Amino acid sequence: MYEKYKNSYKVTEKELVSLSVYNVGFQRCDSLYQWGPGIRDHYLIHYIISGKGFYRIGKRTYELQAGDSFLVYPNTEVVYYAAETDPWEYAWVGFTGSDASMILKATDFSPEKPIIRETPHGSDIHRQILHIYDARGNEFEHA
């Protein structure tokens, strides 16, 4: 049996810069744990470390599993929740800034395809989120 946990940090003041990390964390969820329906005011990438869950944006629901990633766009209503059996564990990074949308255009994410299925680069996404988490410094407060 595993023990659920949540560790997250966020910047208390958003600055008008080209790209800024807003929050970063990781969480092992209970069965059917849900966020939303809700709207974020920043971009938010989740990488599924283990388990399964669902991401709903508009009328589309995506079933996700370990190795997959999903992107929450700002000002868009979404819901995401852990599967009843084998609930997910994920890492995330939230970011904002004037160049955020331009940078995302260089990725495989798009409003029409807000998920990336398990790829050889999936572990790179996870590793980069963990690097950001490890480098959080003193500007973040525990959320």
Language model features with spans:
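A short, N-terminal "cap"/entry segment at the start of jelly-roll beta-barrel domains
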Residues: 1-20, 135-136
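A general boundary/transition motif marking the beginning of the first structured unit of a protein
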Residues: 12, 91, 116-117
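N-terminal regulatory/effector-sensing and dimerization cores
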Residues: 16, 20-111
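Amphipathic alpha-helical segments enriched in hydrophobic/aromatic residues interleaved with Lys/Arg
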Residues: 102-143
